Curated annotation (Swiss-Prot):
Protein name from the UniProt record: Recombination protein RecR
Native source organism of the sequence: Pseudomonas syringae pv. syringae (strain B728a)
Functional note: May play a role in DNA repair. It seems to be involved in an RecBC-independent recombinational process of DNA repair. It may act with RecF and RecO.
Zinc finger (C4-type): 57-72
The UniProt record lists the keyword DNA repair: yes
GO biological process: DNA recombination; DNA repair
Keyword terms of this UniProt record: DNA damage, DNA recombination, DNA repair, Metal-binding, Zinc, Zinc-finger
SUPFAM superfamilies assigned: Recombination protein RecR
NCBIfam families according to UniProt: recR
Sequence ranges assigned to domain Toprim in this UniProt record: 80-175
Gene (UniProt): recR
Pfam families on file: RecR_C, RecR_HhH, RecR_ZnF, Toprim_4
Family that this chain belongs to: Belongs to the RecR family.
GO function terms (MF aspect): DNA binding; zinc ion binding
Length: 200
């Protein structure tokens, strides 16, 4: 089927979302245009406001509308623990476990084949944060249990070991090959409780 340029543009815009293919994007676009124009307008307005108003926390780099996210602005958090995650969705997943320490959000994981080295994902900024804060006694590496996530955790653990800092890895109650934001809170809480230091 051939779509007009504006409909094609809308379909292509929906396809930037993860897990949305051609058919799903077509259904979404046609649903909004045929049956829910007011919903489409609300979606466009909310998307525009979020794109303009949401940035990154200057401390942990998660998504926020303020200079500091709620976790970094909270003085009651444990300043001796730092949890390193791959993305903002992982912060929300870890928060469900009752974790009360600080965070640092990488921009993904190491993937040399995709051109993502330490600088691209923010490892130098992580090491700078650890040095500047000076209060962390344990760094919990909560990268995804994928090959790339494991490689990222090992790389960071080596840097921390060289500085005499303790690095731990969340236990693997989280399924290998899984994504943190898809794991239920109970499983993730069990994984955090069973974390172990990374031996060097």
């Amino acid at each position: 089927m051939s779509f007009s340029p504006l409909i094609r543009q809308l379909i292509d815009a929906f396809r930037v979302l993860p897990g949305v293919g051609q058919k799903t994007a077509q259904r979404m676009a046609l649903q909004l245009l045929e049956r829910d124009r007011s919903g489409g307008s609300r979606l466009a307005q909310a998307l525009g406001q979020a794109m303009d108003g949401v940035g990154h926390c200057r401390s942990c780099r998660t998504l926020t509308e303020e200079e500091l996210c709620p976790q970094c602005a909270d003085p009651r958090r444990d300043d001796t623990l730092l949890c390193v995650v791959e993305g903002p969705t992982d912060v929300y997943a870890v928060e469900q476990t009752g974790y009360r320490g600080r965070y640092f959000v990488l921009k993904g994981h190491l993937s040399p084949l995709d051109g993502l080295g330490p600088e691209a994902i923010g490892i130098p900024q992580l090491m700078e944060r650890i040095s500047q804060q000076g209060t962390f006694t344990e760094v919990i590496l909560a990268t995804n249990p994928t090959v790339e996530g494991e490689a990222t955790a090992h790389y960071i653990a080596q840097l921390l070991h060289d500085k005499g800092l303790v690095a731990s890895r969340i236990a693997h109650g989280v399924p290998l090959g899984g994504e943190l934001d898809l794991v239920d809170g109970g499983t993730l809480a069990h994984s955090f409780a069973g974390r172990k230091p990374i031996a060097m």
